[in-house]
Design a protein with these regions (language model features):
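Membrane-embedded alpha-helical bundles of multi-pass transporters/translocases
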Residues: 2-487
C-alpha cells in the first residue's frame, strides 16, 4: 500500500460558498444535457440510418460494434487526459465541458444530416463512420469530466448522495423528454413516414437545448476540491493503484451486472408484452417504470443513506428486487396486471442502486486517494464507464443470441406467430435475467465491497484533514484557492 502523502500533487478544499441547491440543480441539468445527445442517438439514430439514409441493419451493426469498442477505450484515455490537464480558476472539469460541448453538439447535428442519403453508398458509409466515431469520442470528452466533477463538488457523503440523486433525476427527465416528445415531430402524412428534414431540425433543437443545459451546469456548480499536480503519475503506478483499490474492482463488477440487466431486461420486456401478453398498452406502462421509479425513490435516498448507509441500503433494495422477479419466475403468471405490479416493485429494487451509483463512484474516488495518496477522479470514473460500455456491448450481442437460441422466429411482415414453447421461454428470460443479475450484484456488495457507512465516513474525515493540511496560505493570508490559476 502506498503512502497517503504524494509529493507530486496537492489537494485542498478551497474557500467557496457551501454546497447548496445550486450545485444540485446545476448538476442535474448536466445529465439532462447529456440525454439531449446520448438518448437521441441511442433511441433514434439506427432508425434514421435505416429509414432515411438507406443503410442495412448489418452495416449499422458493424458500425456500432466498432464504435463501441473505440468509445470504451476513449473513456479511459479522456479520464487520464483530464486528470493530467492544467488546473484552471474554475476547476479542472468544467473547462473541459465548456470547450468540448461545442464539437459534441456539432457532431450530433452532423449525424442527422438528411442530404447524405443522395450520396454514393461508399461515401455515405465513410461519412457515417467518421461522424459517429467523432460523436462518441467528443461525448466521452464531455461526460467523463462531468461524471468526475461530482467528487470535486463536495467530499461530504450526504452531499454526494444528493448529487447522485439529482443526476439520476436529470437522466430520467432527459430520457423521458427525448423518448416521448421526439416521435411526435419526425413523422409525416397518414402513413406516418419518417421525414429526414424534420428529423434534422428536431436534432438541431435538441443540440441547442443540450448547450443550454451544459451552460447551466457550468455556471451553477462549484468545484471545491482541487488538485494541483507538479508531475504526471506514471502509468504503471496508476494501474497498480487501480488494482489495490478493491472497491473499484468490485464496483465495476457490480455495475456490469446492473447494466447487463438493464439492457437485456429492456429488450426482453418488449418481446414479452408483444408475444406473451400481446398487450402493447401494458408494454408502454412497463417501459415507463424505469423513469417513474427513479422519481419516486429520489426523495428518500438521502434519508436512507444517512440512516443506514449507501452500501447497506442498496443490498436490501437489490435483494428485494431480485425476490420480486423470482416470484414472477416461479408463479409464471398470465395476468398482465399482476405482472405489472410485481415488475413495479422489482424496478424499485433496481432503481435504488441506479439512484446511488454515481455516489458509489465518488466514494471509490475518495477511497483511491486515501489508499494511494493520488487523486485521479477522471481515470477512476473512466474505468467504470469503460466497464459499463463493455457490459452494453455484451448485452447487445447476448440478447440477439438468446432469441436465436430459444427458437424465436423473425419476420419482415410485422411479426411471426411464436410457438407456445418459445413464448414461455421469453417469459423465463424476462424474469430469470433480473433475478440472477440483481442477486449477484447484491451478493458482491454484501461480501466483497469494502466501503460501508463507517468506512465512507472515515475516509471523508481523513481527506478533510489531509486537504486542510495541504492548504497553502500566501503572506497576505489568502487561501490557496484564491491564488491565480490558469485561465
Amino acid at each position: 500500500m502506498w503512502s497517503t502523502l504524494d509529493k507530486t500533487q496537492k489537494t485542498v478544499t478551497i474557500d467557496a460558498a457551501p454546497f447548496n441547491i445550486k450545485d444540485k440543480v446545476g448538476y442535474m441539468f448536466g445529465d439532462i444535457g447529456n440525454n439531449f445527445s446520448f438518448n437521441v442517438v441511442n433511441s433514434f439514430l439506427m432508425i434514421f440510418y435505416t429509414n432515411v439514409l438507406g443503410l442495412t441493419g448489418a452495416q449499422v451493426g458493424i458500425l456500432f460494434l466498432i464504435a463501441r469498442f473505440v468509445d470504451a477505450f476513449a473513456d479511459i484515455t479522456v479520464g487520464r487526459l483530464v486528470d493530467n490537464s492544467k488546473l484552471h480558476k474554475s476547476g479542472r472539469f468544467k473547462p473541459w465541458m465548456s470547450r468540448m460541448q461545442y464539437p459534441l453538439l456539432i457532431f450530433l447535428v452532423l449525424l442527422f444530416v438528411p442530404v447524405v442519403k443522395d450520396w454514393a453508398l461508399p461515401v455515405r458509409l465513410v461519412f457515417v463512420f467518421i461522424t459517429y466515431l467523432g460523436w462518441g469520442i467528443f461525448y466521452s470528452c464531455v461526460n467523463i469530466p462531468y461524471g468526475s466533477m461530482a467528487a470535486a463538488i463536495s467530499s461530504d457523503p450526504n452531499d454526494k448522495t444528493s448529487l447522485s440523486t439529482f443526476r439520476a433525476l436529470g437522466s430520467a427527465l432527459g430520457s423521458a423528454i427525448t423518448s416521448y416528445i421526439i416521435p411526435l415531430f419526425i413523422y409525416i402524412g397518414a402513413t406516418q413516414k419518417i421525414s429526414g428534414t424534420r428529423f434534422f431540425w428536431v436534432v438541431v433543437v435538441c443540440a441547442f437545448l443540450g448547450w443550454g443545459c451544459y451552460e447551466l451546469t457550468i455556471h451553477l456548480t462549484t468545484e471545491r476540491i482541487r488538485t494541483e499536480k507538479s508531475a504526471k503519475v506514471p502509468l504503471s503506478r496508476l494501474v497498480q493503484g487501480m488494482f489495490e483499490n478493491k472497491a473499484l474492482i468490485v464496483l465495476v463488477l457490480i455495475d456490469i451486472m446492473i447494466v447487463i440487466n438493464q439492457n437485456l431486461s429492456g429488450t426482453m420486456i418488449s418481446y414479452l408484452f408483444n408475444d406473451y401478453f400481446k398487450d402493447k398498452a401494458a408494454m408502454s406502462i412497463a417501459l415507463i417504470f424505469n423513469f417513474a421509479t427513479v422519481i419516486l425513490l429520489a426523495p428518500f435516498s438521502n434519508f436512507l443513506t444517512k440512516r443506514f448507509g449507501r452500501k447497506e441500503t442498496s443490498i436490501v433494495a437489490l435483494l428485494f428486487g431480485a425476490l420480486m422477479y423470482c416470484i414472477l419466475l416461479v408463479v409464471h403468471t398470465q395476468s398482465t396486471s399482476f405482472y405489472l405490479i410485481m415488475l413495479f416493485f422489482g424496478s424499485l429494487g433496481a432503481g435504488m442502486f441506479n439512484l446511488m451509483v454515481w455516489a458509489f463512484i465518488t466514494d471509490v474516488i475518495d477511497n483511491h486517494e486515501v489508499l494511494t495518496g493520488v487523486r485521479e477522479d477522471g481515470i477512476v470514473y473512466g474505468v467504470n464507464s469503460f466497464a459499463r460500455k463493455v457490459a452494453q456491448a455484451i448485452a447487445g450481442g447476448f440478447g440477439g443470441f438468446m432469441l436465436t437460441f430459444i427458437g424465436y422466429q423473425s419476420s419482415t411482415g410485422g411479426g411471426a406467430e411464436q410457438s407456445v414453447t418459445v413464448i414461455h421461454r421469453i417469459y423465463n428470460l424476462a424474469t430469470g435475467i433480473p433475478t440472477v443479475c440483481l442477486s449477484v450484484a447484491a451478493l458482491l456488495l454484501l461480501f466483497f465491497y469494502p466501503l460501508n457507512k463507517k468506512r465512507v465516513t472515515e475516509n471523508a474525515r481523513k481527506l478533510e484533514e489531509l486537504h486542510e493540511e495541504n492548504r497553502v496560505r500566501k503572506p497576505s493570508g489568502k487561501a490557496w484557492g484564491s491564488t491565480k490559476l490558469a485561465g
